[in-house]
């Protein structure tokens, strides 16, 4: 059995009643709440760390997790999926660079302040940048797999990690 995968984003139904447009609306609403100061109490007292990604959970229930993430230049998430969860993000400030696997090769896009992105099941990407963003996952993340692209342009899963409820996605 080969460990190389040929994953493509698909319209596979998710184990949640929420859909991608719902998650985009959620990240937009929470981004507005962050800008209005609703979550100031969650921000680090001395400002965001200079050398690491920072995150805080803004909301959690049985079908939805919402995170605020501060990204630092030079740090990336590595190429990963979101297990059995759908995802979405809204960039509040700065810019994120997303490298995603389209089933055949890597594609790149930049997301600036105000931009949104949605992640269906099977979405494999790497995110980096210097930004503040809100992310929503439904159902809440329980596992993430990490990948490498092989010389023959296939995905190879390198590891799968269970997510820690306290460690943002």
Outline where the language-model segments fall.
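Glycine- and acidic-residue-biased ligand/ion/polar-headgroup-sensing regions
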Residues: 73, 84-99
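Conserved short histidine dyad/triad with adjacent acidic residue
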Residues: 67-82, 111, 120-122
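Short beta-strand His + acidic residue motifs that chelate non-heme Fe in jelly-roll/DSBH
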Residues: 78-80, 98-99, 124-130, 135
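N-terminal leader/capping segments at the start of a protein or of a new domain
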Residues: 1-43
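Short acidic-glycine-tyrosine-enriched beta hairpin
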Residues: 88, 100-129, 159
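A short glycine-rich, His/Asp/Glu-containing loop-to-beta-strand
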Residues: 44-73
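Conserved strand-loop elements at the edges of beta-sheets that form or border functional pockets
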Residues: 60, 81-83, 90, 129
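Double-stranded beta-helix
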Residues: 130-169
């Amino acid at each position: 059995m080969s460990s190389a995968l040929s994953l493509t984003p698909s319209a596979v139904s998710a184990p949640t009643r929420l859909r991608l447009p719902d998650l985009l609306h959620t990240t937009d609403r929470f981004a507005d709440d962050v800008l209005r100061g609703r979550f100031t109490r969650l921000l680090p007292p001395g400002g965001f760390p200079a050398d690491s990604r920072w995150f805080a959970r803004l909301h959690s229930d049985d079908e939805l997790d919402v995170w605020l993430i501060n990204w630092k230049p030079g740090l990336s998430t590595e190429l990963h999926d979101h297990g059995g969860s759908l995802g979405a993000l809204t960039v509040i400030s700065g810019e994120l660079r997303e490298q995603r696997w389209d089933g055949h090769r890597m594609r790149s896009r930049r997301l600036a302040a105000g931009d949104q992105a949605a992640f269906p099941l099977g979405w494999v990407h790497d995110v980096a940048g210097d930004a503040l963003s809100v992310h929503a996952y439904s159902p809440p993340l329980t596992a993430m797999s990490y990948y490498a692209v092989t010389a023959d342009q296939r995905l190879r899963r390198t590891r799968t990690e269970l997510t820690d409820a306290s460690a943002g996605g």
